[in-house]
A protein has these predicted regions:
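Bacterial N-terminal signal peptides that target proteins for export
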Residues: 1-8
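Bacterial N-terminal signal peptides
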Residues: 9-18
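Bacterial signal peptide processing site
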Residues: 21-24
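Extended, alpha-helix-rich binding/interface surfaces that flank or overlap catalytic cores
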Residues: 32-104, 108-118, 124-201
């Protein structure tokens, strides 16, 4: 969870100071409105999937962080056999795998740990409405040298054998991903809502 916004934290400190000196908050600090407070206090993080239906999870977005609700949907889908997954469910898993692995170790880690999604990830990102992230990811795949006929094992081996030069070329794409040019969690949640009939937990 992100820390409180600096300005709000300072305002709280000034309020406490005013209370200790017998003054009012208005004497020492600008007024902090309810809207300002709501903007800097984040929703809590939903702690994993707990057997809810998809409708129940989607209703939780009013209370919990969007990314945590999407993670819970992923957690439920990971319990299903691969053969039982619908096309929209595969999109959810592909995008979540990308976000998890790239954030933990860059695109190389995604190629190494989740090779089964390499061929479909660009299309999946475009399908949920994240074209900039799709472009960045396709550029990263070009550095890997991905070929249409490569198997999962070949993708993992290619990732493990990347040269220092290739790794250096990946860095700008890692950084571009970290900048989040598209709101991935919000777009993925909207995709889940739009395809709820084909997403079964």
């Amino acid at each position: 969870m992100k820390p409180l916004h600096t300005g709000f934290a300072v305002a709280l400190g000034l309020v406490a100071l005013a209370g200790g000196c017998g003054g009012s908050a208005a004497d020492v600090a600008p007024t902090t409105t309810a809207t300002d407070t709501a903007a800097v206090i984040e929703k809590p993080f939903l702690d994993g999937y707990g057997g809810q239906s998809l409708a129940e999870l989607l209703a939780m977005t009013d209370t919990y962080r969007t990314d945590s609700v999407v993670l819970a949907v992923e957690g439920a889908l990971l319990q299903k056999a691969n053969a039982d997954l619908s096309a929209p469910e595969r999109v959810v898993l592909a995008v979540e795998a990308l976000e998890r692995e790239v954030n933990n170790g860059g695109y190389n880690q995604f190629f190494l740990n989740e090779p089964s999604y390499a061929h479909q990830i660009g299309a999946a990102l475009n399908e949920i409405g994240c074209p900039e992230t799709a472009r960045i990811t396709e550029d990263a795949l070009a550095v890997l040298g991905l070929r249409p006929d490569w198997t999962d094992e070949q993708i993992s081996v290619a990732a493990a054998d990347m040269t220092d030069d290739q790794m250096a070329k990946l860095e700008p794409f890692d950084d571009a991903f970290f900048a989040y040019p598209d709101p991935i969690a919000d777009r993925l949640l909207a995709f889940i809502r739009a395809n709820a009939a084909e997403i079964r937990l």
